[in-house]
Swiss-Prot record:
Keywords: Sporulation. InterPro entries: SASP_SspH. The gene is sspH. This is Small, acid-soluble spore protein H. GO terms for biological process: asexual sporulation; sporulation resulting in formation of a cellular spore. Belongs to the SspH family.
């Protein structure tokens, strides 16, 4: 995704469906100087493990 499109998504009043490698994400902010974005994964699976 290019930085202009990512910035449009961040500025939008409606949260569109955005995915990263097929995983739903939320774009929190875009830094156009470094061409990076802060993202959050929307579906995080919790794994419980019991150590012996």
């Amino acid at each position: 995704m290019d930085k202009e499109r990512a910035q449009e998504i961040v500025s939008s009043s409606v949260m569109p469906n955005v995915t990263l490698n097929g995983t739903p994400i939320y774009i929190e902010s875009v830094n156009t100087n470094t061409e990076t974005a802060n993202i959050h994964f929307l579906k995080i699976q919790k794994i419980h493990a019991k150590c012996l």
